[in-house]
């Protein structure tokens, strides 16, 4: 029997930090929209009224990237956790997927999603070591998949380097993109190295231990840390078993690539929505589907290393710079690019942030209700895999 007396996730420090990130995202989004893209309230009305209603179906294509990402958050975590006899109802998984997406959107570098996943699994009764195993064994694949699909786009873009070099904004955007892609590769490598390196485990847990000691929480001695991570090395063995499940590992990589590709094709859908009939000077007349995919792919990656929620500002800067650099643009095309990029962010970031934010509030209400409903409840324990008996199926 375990007594649930406090909800450590909702302490003052976490609430203040989260509120800061949310307010910061809103402020940056407004500043970028008004001062960089030059979109006013009247412009928003104009954008909405200018939508070609014959192409409303393309809105679903834009939103599809968001829905696929949410569905993937649910599928991969459910798929991996079921091996550890973990159970949650379908609606809890669905709510989990939306809240993970919320943290991806509103926290810098999407750093909030993994702590939330850890908290959610542990709160549902999973052992800490098992929860860490699930989170780390799925975390590296997004960065790795981005690297695999972005480098080819970057090489195609580099063929027109001289055009980019002639324009200051596009020249800066080019090098931002290269930095973002290198960042993806480094993060993916760090995930794998940290997971397998015993000394890194000792170092990281020693830092955590010092923090727990400072908070006057239970902590391990140096000998206990050494025994757990060097002599027994249980986590390394379990992580190795998990990563050697080649079918699942390849599935994680390919599925992450599909999620990214679907998302990056969404810009084409936006310009299909905003195209003007009876003219050949639309963005989609000047740029092919593959062109827009490459530009979106690189623009998103360029903001990966910038510690602002959803790469706000950097993504729009790179995208508009490239779109204006490769083709001669008149005022009509320039305005369509500006309006299209804003609409793309509205449908892929701002509205999803509002919707998933509501889901986050629903989840908070659920947690508070559960704590008030039960004072003493038996906590289920989800055991880790037995090294001797569990085989990859």
Curated annotation (Swiss-Prot):
First-listed, main subcellular location of the protein, grouped into a coarse class: membrane
Signal peptide: none
Membrane topology: Multi-pass membrane protein
Stretches that traverse the bilayer: 15-35, 56-76, 86-106, 131-151, 176-196, 253-273, 289-309, 349-369
Annotated keywords: Cell membrane, Membrane, Transmembrane, Transmembrane helix
Keyword Transmembrane helix (UniProt): yes
Compartments, as annotated in UniProt: Cell membrane
Domain of life of the source: Bacteria
UniProt name for this protein: Uncharacterized protein MG306
Source organism: Mycoplasma genitalium (strain ATCC 33530 / DSM 19775 / NCTC 10195 / G37)
């Amino acid at each position: 029997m375990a007594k649930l007396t406090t909800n450590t996730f909702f302490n003052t420090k976490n609430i203040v930090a989260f509120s800061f990130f949310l307010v910061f995202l809103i402020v940056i989004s407004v500043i970028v929209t008004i001062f960089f893209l030059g979109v006013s309230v009247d412009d928003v009305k104009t954008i909405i009224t200018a939508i070609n209603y014959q192409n409303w179906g393309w809105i679903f294509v834009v939103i599809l990237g968001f829905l696929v990402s949410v569905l993937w958050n649910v599928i991969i975590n459910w798929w991996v956790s079921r091996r550890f006899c973990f159970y949650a109802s379908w609606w809890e998984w669905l709510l989990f997927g939306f809240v993970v997406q919320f943290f991806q959107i509103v926290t810098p570098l999407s750093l909030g999603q993994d702590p939330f996943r850890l908290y959610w699994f542990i709160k549902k009764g999973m052992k800490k070591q098992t929860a860490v195993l699930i989170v780390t064994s799925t975390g590296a694949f997004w960065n790795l998949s981005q690297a695999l699909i972005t480098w080819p786009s970057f090489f195609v873009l580099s063929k027109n380097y001289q055009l980019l070099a002639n324009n200051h904004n596009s020249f800066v955007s080019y090098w931002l993109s290269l930095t973002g892609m290198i960042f993806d590769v480094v993060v993916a490598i760090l995930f794998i190295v940290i997971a397998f390196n015993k000394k890194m485990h000792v170092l990281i847990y020693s830092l955590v231990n010092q923090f727990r000691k400072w908070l006057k929480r239970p902590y391990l001695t140096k000998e206990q840390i050494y025994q757990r991570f060097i002599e027994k090395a249980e986590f390394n063995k379990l992580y190795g078993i998990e990563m050697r499940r080649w079918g699942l590992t390849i599935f994680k990589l390919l599925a992450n690539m599909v999620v990214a590709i679907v998302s990056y094709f969404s810009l084409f859908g936006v310009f299909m929505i905003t195209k003007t009939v009876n003219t050949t000077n639309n963005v989609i007349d000047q740029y092919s589907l593959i062109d827009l995919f490459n530009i979106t792919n690189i623009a998103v990656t360029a903001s990966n290393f910038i510690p602002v929620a959803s790469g706000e500002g950097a993504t729009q800067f790179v995208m508009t710079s490239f779109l204006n650099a490769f083709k001669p643009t008149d005022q009509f095309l320039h305005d369509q690019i500006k309006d299209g990029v804003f609409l793309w962010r509205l449908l892929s970031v701002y509205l999803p942030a509002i919707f998933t934010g509501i889901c986050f509030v629903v989840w908070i209400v659920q947690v508070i209700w559960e704590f008030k409903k039960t004072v003493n409840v038996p906590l289920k324990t989800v055991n880790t895999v037995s090294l001797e008996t569990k085989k990859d199926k």
